[in-house]
């Protein structure tokens, strides 16, 4: 008798021809909702249409159908990203001075947009050097392209076409995986398989292929560019890939092929996989051989990580087991039940992902200046400032989004009957202690951090500089930060073998890298001024967290409104009969949190902008004397509120205010217009619904008199709609104002 092991069953994980493709739905706005599909009776209809179009939870309660819609929408999102990317590369190919910039990146500025001569707008085409007139761009694409080894506009053109093809492919995939082969719920919930594929596939093989590209294409091309070879003389990428001898001339170990790899003699490869630390003095960017090494190491880590979870082959970890084993002495059931939450509530899953991604984006913002990854990025001050500001804003929005979806999870997906004594339940049960302590911390930080500034303003006003908190009077040195800096500055010899410099020049150690007479990076000194503003950062961040966390922890119930869960995620007040219950919905906490997020990030980018202009960015003479843009005034000026207003906001706004008649004048107009958008928001935030409804009735009366009254009844915005419109214009106006202020300033002086 032969005993065979049972054949593994092949599970069918898709439904074929799940929903027929039809354009008829497109002709019926609001087809996803019975009420909205009826068409407009009042103007509120258009608001509801926009609010619910992508709220898939409101279309159906079937988790499988919701999952499929989200999955399909992701492909649409990817398609838009590829389309955008294609546009960026197309502008580089068609309208830019990329080839000229490549030949002389220190004297020529990057530009990829030339304004047509209509009503005199061609004034915006500034002279960026090399005889090219256009708008100076600050996105960092030129530096990225050089690091990738792109040497001609034709290559950019081909890449743009490739991205368009991918965009079309993504659109097709979105349609295919909803209409033709829609995955079943089991497929979406198979987390081990998902982790294996995302870790080993996306991150592992993704990093490996990038490392391969860096080694075989980017490194040799950049080596030629750094040596001053004309880009047109450099061999094409495929020649390096196909002809090993060509690479061996630059990196001798290539002649030995894979032998050192299999004989474990890996140090042979140290000519193109390095561990130097610091910056390349020619380009002011990280050593590209360091970054190739980094991506190879990351690839190996993720390829291993992608083989850790149990799928069809009965070996490896199961995520449920891992989570349920997480029990501490004070955490009751620990993470029991978390697996079920994360596989049945996409809001809970999204919330975690947004929190992680938001934090990571802010980490990216800081690394982009401290460890500038691309050639000639560090000396392009406009791009440095833009990249920092951009990643800070994006990170802030993602973190607020994390709180929003955590609250939606609490309202829509949390089932208190099945959750007892797990970590989340325990947090909810002592939420009063958490929130009241956090509130105390906010009050303490607010009064003390602001109090230090007010003290300084008062002493300064009374002419008593010796009694101020400053580096020259009463010092409040950030000793812990200085200790961390010092540790890192001394670390290279003791940690990585062969590392000649620390991970970042900002740590200290006296090294300075300048490219073409401009400072790329140098050790950043920290003093009393930084100590003060860092406590403002602590204050604003804690208040943001207080608002957002309160919204999540009290999303379902509170002492004021015990049945809050029944009212939903967003509601204006708890009915007409109960005063003092407005702005308590989870949505309102997100709304209020956005303002404090805006506060937090504004202080951060102001701090960064001024600190870099004062202590880092500037020019260096032949004698090695550094002249900073604002001459090191941060340490003495930023210790008073008056100093921030006078020497930062007012002094540095002169470029944007005086930009009329120059190529920077668009920023002057934006500065004006964005202030207007910001002020416009206050109209929505400070006036109530009744005021507008009264006004509307009067206007409708006039229309009736003239027999031009519309069939759709005009309605004032609801309370929630007014707040949404208000906060949108507030943030948009504020961010665009800052953008115009920063860019006009840094393009003029940088």
Curated annotation (Swiss-Prot):
GO biological process: photosynthesis
Family, similarity comment: Belongs to the PsaA/PsaB family.
Protein name: Photosystem I P700 chlorophyll a apoprotein A1
Swiss-Prot/TrEMBL keywords: 4Fe-4S, Chlorophyll, Chloroplast, Chromophore, Electron transport, Iron, Iron-sulfur, Magnesium, Membrane, Metal-binding, Oxidoreductase, Photosynthesis, Photosystem I, Plastid, Thylakoid, Transmembrane, Transmembrane helix, Transport
Summary of subunit composition and partner proteins: The PsaA/B heterodimer binds the P700 chlorophyll special pair and subsequent electron acceptors. PSI consists of a core antenna complex that captures photons, and an electron transfer chain that converts photonic excitation into a charge separation. The eukaryotic PSI reaction center is composed of at least 11 subunits.
Subcellular locations according to the entry: Plastid, Chloroplast thylakoid membrane
Cofactor details (free text): P700 is a chlorophyll a/chlorophyll a' dimer, A0 is one or more chlorophyll a, A1 is one or both phylloquinones and FX is a shared 4Fe-4S iron-sulfur center.
InterPro entries tied to this protein: PSI_PsaA, PSI_PsaA/B, PSI_PsaA/B_CS, PSI_PsaA/B_sf
Membrane topology: Multi-pass membrane protein
Organism this protein belongs to: Helianthus annuus (Common sunflower)
Binding-site list for chlorophyll a': 675
Gene: psaA
């Amino acid at each position: 008798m032969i005993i065979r092991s049972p054949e593994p069953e092949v599970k069918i994980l898709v439904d074929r021809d799940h929903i027929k493709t039809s354009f008829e739905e497109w002709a019926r706005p609001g087809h996803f909702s019975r009420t909205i599909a009826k068409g407009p009776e009042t103007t509120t209809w258009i608001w509801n249409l926009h609010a619910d179009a992508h709220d898939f939870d409101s279309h159906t309660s079937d988790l499988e159908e919701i999952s499929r819609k989200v999955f399909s929408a992701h492909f649409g999102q990817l398609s838009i990203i590829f389309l955008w990317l294609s546009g960026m590369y197309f502008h580089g190919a068609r309208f830019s001075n990329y080839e000229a910039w490549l030949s002389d990146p220190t004297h020529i500025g990057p530009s990829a947009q030339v304004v047509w001569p209509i009503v005199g707008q061609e004034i915006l085409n500034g002279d960026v050097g090399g005889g090219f007139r256009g708008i100076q761009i600050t996105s960092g694409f030129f530096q990225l392209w050089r690091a990738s080894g792109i040497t001609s506009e034709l290559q950019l053109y081909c890449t743009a076409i490739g991205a368009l093809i991918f965009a079309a492919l993504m659109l097709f995939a979105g349609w295919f995986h909803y209409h033709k082969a829609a995955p079943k719920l089991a497929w979406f919930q198979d987390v081990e398989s998902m982790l294996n594929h995302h870790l080993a596939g996306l991150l592992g093989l993704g990093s490996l292929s990038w490392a391969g590209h860096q080694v075989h294409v980017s490194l040799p091309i950049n080596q030629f560019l750094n040596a001053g070879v004309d880009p047109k003389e450099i061999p094409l990428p495929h020649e390096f890939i196909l002809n090993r001898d060509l690479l061996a001339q630059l990196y001798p170990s290539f002649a030995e092929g894979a032998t050192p790899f299999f004989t474990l003699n890996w140090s042979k490869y140290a000519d193109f996989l390095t561990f130097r630390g610091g910056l390349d003095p020619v380009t002011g960017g990280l050593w590209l051989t360091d970054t190739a090494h980094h991506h190879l190491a990351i690839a190996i880590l993720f390829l291993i990580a992608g083989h850790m979870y149990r799928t069809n082959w009965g070996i490896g970890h199961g995520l449920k087991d891992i989570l349920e084993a997480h029990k501490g002495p004070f955490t009751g059931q620990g993470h029991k039940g978390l697996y079920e939450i994360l596989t049945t509530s996409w809001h809970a899953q999204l919330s975690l992902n947004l929190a992680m991604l938001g934090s990571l984006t802010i980490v990216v913002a800081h690394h982009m200046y401290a460890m500038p990854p691309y050639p000639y990025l560090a000396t392009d001050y406009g791009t440095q400032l833009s990249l920092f500001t951009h990643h800070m804003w994006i990170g802030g929005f993602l973190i607020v989004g994390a709180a929003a979806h955590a609250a939606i999870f609490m309202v829509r997906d949390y089932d208190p009957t099945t959750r007892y004594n797990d970590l989340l339940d325990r947090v909810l049960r002592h939420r009063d202690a958490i929130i009241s302590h956090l509130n105390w911390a906010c009050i303490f930080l607010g009064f003390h951090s602001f109090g230090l500034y007010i003290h300084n303003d008062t002493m300064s006003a009374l002419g008593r500089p010796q009694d101020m908190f400053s580096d020259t009077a009463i010092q409040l040195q950030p000793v812990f930060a200085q200790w961390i800096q010092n540790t890192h500055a001394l670390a290279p010899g003791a940690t990585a073998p062969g590392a000649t410099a620390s991970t970042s020049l900002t740590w200290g150690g006296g090294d300075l890298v300048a490219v073409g007479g401009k400072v790329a990076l140098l050790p950043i000194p920290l003093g009393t001024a930084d100590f003060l503003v860092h406590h403002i950062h602590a204050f604003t961040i804690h208040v943001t967290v207080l608002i957002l966390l309160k919204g999540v922890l009290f999303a379902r119930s509170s002492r004021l409104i015990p049945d809050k869960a029944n009212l939903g995620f967003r509601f204006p007040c708890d009915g007409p009969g109960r005063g003092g219950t407005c702005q308590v919905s989870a949505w309102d906490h997100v709304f209020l949190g956005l303002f404090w997020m805006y506060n937090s990030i504004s202080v951060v980018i102001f701090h960064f902008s001024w600190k870099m202009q004062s202590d880092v960015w500037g020019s260096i003479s032949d004698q090695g004397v550094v002249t900073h843009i604002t001459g090191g005034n941060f340490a003495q000026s930023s210790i008073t509120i008056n100093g921030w207003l006078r020497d930062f906001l007012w002094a540095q706004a002169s470029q944007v205010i005086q930009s009329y008649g120059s190529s920077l004048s668009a920023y002057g107009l934006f500065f004006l217009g964005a202030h207007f958008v910001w002020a416009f928001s206050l109209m929505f935030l400070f006036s109530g619904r009744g005021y507008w409804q009264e006004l509307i009735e009067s206007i409708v009366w006039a229309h009736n008199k003239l027999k031009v009254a519309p069939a759709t009844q005009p309605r004032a915005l609801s309370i929630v709609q007014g707040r949404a419109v208000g906060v949108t214009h507030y943030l948009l106006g504020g961010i665009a104002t800052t953008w115009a202020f920063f860019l006009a300033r840094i393009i003029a002086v940088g």
